Amino acid sequence: MKNIRNFSIIAHIDHGKSTLSDRIIQICGGLSDREMEAQVLDSMDLERERGITIKAQSVTLDYKASDGETYQLNFIDTPGHVDFSYEVSRSLAACEGALLVVDAGQGVEAQTLANCYTAMEMDLEVVPVLNKIDLPAADPERVAEEIEDIVGIDATEAVRCSAKTGVGVQDVLERLVRDIPPPEGDPEGPLQALIIDSWFDNYLGVVSLIRIKNGTLRKGDKVKVMSTGQTYNADRLGIFTPKQVDRTELKCGEVGWLVCAIKDIHGAPVGDTLTLARNPAEKALPGFKKVKPQVYAGLFPVSSDDYEAFRDALGKLSLNDASLFYEPESSSALGFGFRCGFLGLLHMEIIQERLEREYDLDLITTAPTVVYEVETTSREVIYVDSPSKLPAVNNIYELREPIAECHMLLPQAYLGNVITLCVEKRGVQTNMVYHGNQVALTYEIPMAEVVLDFFDRLKSTSRGYASLDYNFKRFQASDMVRVDVLINGERVDALALITHRDNSQNRGRELVEKMKDLIPRQQFDIAIQAAIGTHIIARSTVKQLRKNVLAKCYGGDISRKKKLLQKQKEGKKRMKQIGNVELPQEAFLAILHVGKDNK
């Protein structure tokens, strides 16, 4: 056991985690040169296209160190986006140390800090690594100082490397073996294995990624899931070298995968503990704290025949993604679907794309909303995650919206722009600290504003230099109203949105104008109105198409023309009474863009 090293690679987006993993795999000979490709661990097509890591991946390698010993390295490549930070915290729970990768050109950014603090809270050994030293803009001295100033760990000895060219990666491995402690645990004790991640394989059923904390797991053992008490046979187990390799046993301190022919998706939840049926452990390992979704949206299949397939797909996906929450929902405009909870907008986009790609579904998404806390006049507190569930105005005593605490790191030059943006988003400044050339800003901003487009606007006002990390702080009373959309006098539930009273006029007007452009003209007038309660705040009309009934009249009597026009008018009136308005998919997406700048 003293030769096992478990570690994660953590860093801000694009600081070179995945490339460094590639080099480590290459040096340790996990894959032959022929099988090697860039970002070997980003196995999902989506990850490759967007150039981001979404799922944490684990690899087991053997490294022959300069002291002549052979070490077993179990390492996990983690995502950098704030939406996937729960993946990072789960990966860290399986490790004794972390490589903190910092771009020697960019310096410390918000995610670097957030991930590093997560690692420190879990008492992990953090090893700083300065990456990209081959860049002309690299300034390792300055960045090392920044790490000490802002993060507070000693970086004078930080390893310098370039994952792209491979310079210094050997030193990273040597430092790892030296600084990261070996796992603790009792190989002879009762088995305790933590489920770090799981996914669904069409042939094998549920595959779980586990870290053995105590004891040993052998092939053919009967294992018991601590939370449900279910027992299963350990059919196959092994490690990733990134390829799946079968082994006969997993020893104490190792990280590997396990297949137990579990068909039920919720059979082995992530964060649970496995133990042996014949010699069970006394208590379960401390799991992970459940992540609360921050953003909710309705997802509906375009054709209602896909509903069953959609439900199965969500089940399989939620196994792989512990933070995805879903419950059935029906809408009068869109039929049956699900209300899903996500960690942020990027997460929502990714899930939607994965459903459309991997499971071949066509989906309509309604506007994302955050969770509001509502105290009704009868003093009961309810949580509302969709505008249609909001009680009537006269039944609400107080409506509270979620406030996010946002930590931003940016160069001083952009401070003015960023503060203006935060104020516009109804933010309140709580802290501001100068570190050399960088400023650390802390603002409390309503979650609804952060979720809408705050990140994009922050990047554009600071030319991409500012970075953001946010988390939920509390609920706070606020003057929020629901804006309904009426089409020919009928409410369309899927188009409602909750917004602050100050913005409601503008949002309503903007939404109505957008809808006017998107709804195709029909044989009768379509009135589009935005209303708060019974009070109409905006209106526009999609004009009818009409045939020129007078084309056949040459000269002739005025009464003849009047008769024809009158007849057409009555026809249109009848049509309007029975006519239905078909809303195109774009109309539902229009709400996503309300309140965003059209620059």
UniProtKB/Swiss-Prot annotation:
Lineage: Bacteria, Pseudomonadati, Pseudomonadota, Gammaproteobacteria, Enterobacterales
GO cellular component: plasma membrane
PANTHER family cross-referenced by the UniProt entry: TRANSLATION FACTOR GUF1 HOMOLOG, CHLOROPLASTIC, TRANSLATION FACTOR GUF1-RELATED
UniProt keyword terms in alphabetical order: Cell inner membrane, Cell membrane, GTP-binding, Hydrolase, Membrane, Nucleotide-binding, Protein biosynthesis
Main function: Required for accurate and efficient protein synthesis under certain stress conditions. May act as a fidelity factor of the translation reaction, by catalyzing a one-codon backward translocation of tRNAs on improperly translocated ribosomes. Back-translocation proceeds from a post-translocation (POST) complex to a pre-translocation (PRE) complex, thus giving elongation factor G a second chance to translocate the tRNAs correctly. Binds to ribosomes in a GTP-dependent manner.
Organism: Escherichia coli O8 (strain IAI1)
Membrane topology: Peripheral membrane protein
GO biological process annotation, one example: positive regulation of translation
Name of the protein described by the UniProt record: Elongation factor 4
GO molecular function: GTP binding; GTPase activity; guanosine tetraphosphate binding; ribosome binding; translation elongation factor activity
EC number: 3.6.5.n1
Residue intervals of the tr-type G domain: 2-184
InterPro entries the UniProt entry points to: EF-4, EFG_III/V, EFG_V-like, EFTu-like_2, G_TR_CS, LepA_C_sf, LepA_CTD, LepA_IV
Major enzyme class: hydrolase
Stored SUPFAM superfamilies: EF-G C-terminal domain-like, P-loop containing nucleoside triphosphate hydrolases
Residues the record lists as binding GTP: D14, H15, G16, K17, S18, T19, N131, K132, I133, D134
Gene from which this protein is expressed: lepA
Assigned protein family: Belongs to the TRAFAC class translation factor GTPase superfamily. Classic translation factor GTPase family. LepA subfamily.
